Structure formats: structure tokens, C-alpha cells
């Protein structure tokens, strides 16, 4: 059978190579199959390199195959991203999954997933209560989880890892999940020997700085960025009617009105995101909607 890795590899770096080598040592007879995002990432941004370029580096690191996650999976919130990716593992007969985790407690993830499955109605009621208070889905979900099981999962990789395990448990998939302790925090600007977070490396890449200590990837030019398309986005929002904007995927509860107003005030991409996000709407959701508007992705 095979071990699956679900990833963006944005960029592919030494921490990812460490995980691949760990899997080779722990499961020497298993194929390693990677399921990787394409051009666009979960936060609605453009990956620093094309799917094919990243795939080349990943194959050179010793994995067996690399498959592309569909757009409708790779540009979604954690729970939808996880459901789509895990379903793909199941369809490709992958029977093991390994993911990075800050907590590194797979038994805890399974305990929480099973508790949620057995108390789904109670969890959904608590979730609705917190959503009614004006909280965004990630915060409401975290608080509903804490009130039900006594644990609050707050770190990015733990949140995604729990969603993977929930997708496995809820669908009774024959997939065993494992986790590996992360060496660097998700958004950390600190480095550790030859390791650095993908977030920090992207900052260096966009400044044309050398990342060879932390990644095998070579960048001869500055990659394209979603920020470069703000003017196009702005004109689309201005020229599109509220009724048509409301048809864009993820737009709900009058967000089209909010976008119409803010786009006249915000001078650039970051300014728009900062003005548009709120307790209810995370920056990541705003960025995904901005991408969907640019690409005209309807509900």
C-alpha cells in the first residue's frame, strides 16, 4: 500500500524533505504519494512556483508519485480542504496519512474526532450558538470543540490535522493517520539550523533573497503574486452589479455590499483585506473570495 502526504509545498523546503526521509525510515517498503495544491493555495494566493516545478523537486526528494488536488479542494477552508483531500487519498487506495503537527498527539486527534462523531447534534448546536454571536467559522468551531471535549485546537497544522482525522473517522475510510512534530512554528520568522517556515521563505523569495540554506528550490525571478491583480479585482467589483457579485462562491450575508464599499477606499490588496476582515470573516476567507471574483467562480 502507500503513505499519503497532503501539501502545498509553497515553497518546498528542508522541513518537507525531513518528513519524506522520516517516512522512508519508518515505512521503508511503502510508496510515498503526495497530493499537492496547484497554482492557487488554500488562502487564495498564487503559489511561488507552478505545480510542475514543485512536483519536480518533490520527486527528486524521493517520493513515488505527485498528484494535483483539484481547485475546488485546494482553495477552501480547512474542513472542506481536508474532506476533499482525504477522499482523494481513499480513491487512490492510500491507506496511511502523515502530517505535520504542533501538538504531535495522534491519539488526541482520534479521541476528538470520535467524540464529535458520536455527539454531532450537540456539537452543531454549540457551533450555531457561537456563530450567532458573530464569530467566524474557525473561532466558533474551536470554541464549540472546547465546550464539548475540553480541548481547544488553535495551531494551524493541528487544526488541519484534526480535520484530516475527522474526515477519515466520519467516512469510515481505511486510512491510518500519523503525525510528525513540527520543528518551526507556522508563521515563525525564526530559523532553526537549516529549517525555516514556508511563510518566512516566501517573504525572502519576494525580496529576491537567497533561500538555498533552507530549500533546494531556485528562483531566478520574483514569482507572480495575487497582490499584482488588485487593480483588476477592483475594476471587477466596481463594474459588477451587487446581484451578480452575490452569485460568487463564498459570498453571503451581504458581503457583496461590504466589498462594493471597501473597494472604493482601499488602495491595494493588503489594505482591502485588512478593511474587509472582521471577527466573523477571516482574512483567509476574504482572500479566497477575492480570488473567486478574479476567476469568476460562481456558487
UniProtKB/Swiss-Prot annotation:
Single GO biological process annotation from the record: tRNA modification
Reaction(s) this enzyme catalyzes, per UniProt: cytidine(34) in elongator tRNA(Met) + acetate + ATP = N(4)-acetylcytidine(34) in elongator tRNA(Met) + AMP + diphosphate
One Pfam family named in its UniProt record: HIGH_NTase1
GO molecular function, one term: ligase activity, forming carbon-nitrogen bonds
Hydrolase in keyword set: no
Leading EC class: ligase
Gene Ontology CC entries for this record: cytoplasm
Keyword terms of this UniProt record: ATP-binding, Cytoplasm, Ligase, Nucleotide-binding, RNA-binding, tRNA processing, tRNA-binding
Residue numbers binding ATP: 6-19, 100, 157, 182
UniProt entry tagged with the keyword ATP-binding: yes
Enzyme Commission identifier(s): 6.3.4.-
Coiled coil: none
Cell compartment(s), UniProt: Cytoplasm
Main location: cytoplasm
Function comment: Catalyzes the formation of N(4)-acetylcytidine (ac(4)C) at the wobble position of elongator tRNA(Met), using acetate and ATP as substrates. First activates an acetate ion to form acetyladenylate (Ac-AMP) and then transfers the acetyl group to tRNA to form ac(4)C34.
Similarity comment text for this entry: Belongs to the TmcAL family.
HAMAP family: TmcAL
Protein name: tRNA(Met) cytidine acetate ligase
Lineage of origin: Bacteria, Bacillati, Mycoplasmatota, Mycoplasmoidales, Metamycoplasmataceae
Amino acid at each position: 500500500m502507500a503513505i499519503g502526504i497532503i501539501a502545498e509545498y509553497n515553497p518546498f523546503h528542508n522541513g518537507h524533505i525531513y518528513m519524506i526521509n522520516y517516512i522512508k525510515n519508518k515505512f521503508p517498503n511503502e510508496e510515498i504519494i503526495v497530493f499537492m495544491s496547484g497554482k492557487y493555495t488554500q488562502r487564495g494566493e498564487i503559489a511561488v512556483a507552478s505545480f510542475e516545478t514543485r512536483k519536480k523537486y518533490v520527486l527528486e526528494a524521493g517520493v513515488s508519485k505527485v498528484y494535483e488536488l483539484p481547485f475546488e479542494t485546494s482553495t477552501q477552508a480547512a474542513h472542506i480542504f481536508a474532506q476533499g483531500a482525504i477522499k482523494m487519498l481513499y480513491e487512490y487506495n492510500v491507506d496511511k496519512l502523515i502530517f505535520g503537527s504542533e501538538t504531535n498527539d495522534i491519539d488526541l486527534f482520534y479521541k476528538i474526532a470520535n467524540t464529535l462523531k458520536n455527539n454531532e447534534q450537540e456539537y452543531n448546536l454549540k457551533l450555531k450558538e457561537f456563530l450567532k454571536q458573530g464569530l467566524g467559522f474557525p473561532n466558533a468551531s474551536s470554541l464549540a470543540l472546547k465546550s464539548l471535549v475540553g480541548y481547544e485546537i488553535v495551531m494551524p497544522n493541528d487544526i488541519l490535522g484534526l480535520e484530516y482525522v475527522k474526515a477519515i473517522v466520519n467516512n469510515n475510510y481505511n486510512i491510518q493517520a500519523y503525525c510528525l512534530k513540527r520543528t518551526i512554528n507556522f508563521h515563525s520568522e525564526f530559523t532553526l539550523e537549516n529549517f525555516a517556515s514556508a511563510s518566512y521563505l516566501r517573504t525572502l523569495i519576494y525580496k529576491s533573497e537567497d533561500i538555498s540554506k533552507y530549500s533546494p528550490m531556485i528562483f531566478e525571478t520574483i514569482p507572480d503574486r495575487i497582490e499584482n491583480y488588485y487593480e483588476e479585482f477592483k475594476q471587477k467589483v466596481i463594474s459588477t452589479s451587487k446581484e451578480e457579485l452575490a452569485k460568487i462562491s463564498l459570498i453571503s450575508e451581504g458581503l457583496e455590499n461590504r466589498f462594493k464599499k471597501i473597494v472604493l477606499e482601499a488602495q491595494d490588496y493588503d489594505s482591502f483585506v485588512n478593511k474587509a476582515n472582521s471577527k466573523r470573516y477571516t482574512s483567509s476567507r476574504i482572500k479566497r473570495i477575492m480570488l473567486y471574483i478574479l476567476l469568476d467562480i460562481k456558487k
